[in-house]
C-alpha cells in the first residue's frame, strides 16, 4: 500500500468523523479501535492515491482518486470497489469534493497537482449529480492540474477551485476560481502571474465566506530536476466568499529571505481561529500554527522529518473535536496531541 493511499484514507477517516453521531446511534468500546491495524483495502490500480472523500452519515460510502486510474467508489467500507470514471478522457485525479448539503453532487478535479518528473496532467473539472454514475465536463481544461476543490456546506452550487496550471510552462489558467452556479461558469478570483498556481484552498468550518488559499510558484522541467520554490508562493485569505483576497504572511518564511516553497494548510474544525500550515523552505521550514485566524504565525516544530518531501505531500489535518490533535503526512504520518 503506497504512502499516498495510506494518508488519503487515513485523512478521509478524519473528515468523515466531523459530524457528531445521530441521537440513538450505536455505541462502541473505544478499546476495539486500539486493536485495529492498517491493512490493504484497495483498489488495486492506478498508482498513488491523491484524493479521497467520504459522506459523514454514510460511513460505508467513500471515493478515492488515483494518479492514473480515475475515480473509484466503495459502498461497503472498502470491501469492494467499482471504477466510476473509466469512460472519461483522463484518468489523472487531483481532487474529489462532495457537496455536504447533497452528497449525490460530486466534483472531480483532474490532474494530480504535483510537480515531479512522473506526474500526470488532466483536462479540467467534472461534475456528477447521481453519486458518480454519470459525469459532465465543466471546464478549466487548460488548468491541467486541479489539486483541491471546496464546496459551500449549505449550497452545492457554490465552490472554490484551486488550479495549479501546467507544470511545464507559463499559462494564465491558474489560481483560485469561483463558481456560484454549480460549475456552469467560473470566475478567476485570485491570481498572481502565469508562473504561480493555487495548490490548496480550505473553508472556515464556521463561515463559508471565509477561506484560505495557498499559491505555489513551481515548474517541472522535462528532465529530473525542477524548480519548487518561488516568489509567488504564499497564503491568502478572503472573508467575502472569494471576491477579495489579501496575503497573510506575518511570521511565515518568505522567498527572498528563506526560499519559500510549497505550503499545506488546514483549519481546526472545532476552533476556526486555529490554523496549521506545513511549510517547505530552504530556511525556517516546519509546522506553523496560527491562533488568530491566520493573522500571525508561529513555528512550532522544525523537525525536518515532519515536512520531508513537502513538495509532494504538504498534508496537515486536525482532529474534528480536538484542536490539539494534529496529523501531518511526509514520508510517514506524524501525530501530535499537544497542538
Q: Where are the language model's segments positioned?
A:
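Bacterial N-terminal signal peptides
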Residues: 6-18
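Beta-propeller blade termini and top-face loops
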Residues: 23-339
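N-terminal secretory signal peptides that target proteins for export/translocation
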Residues: 1-3
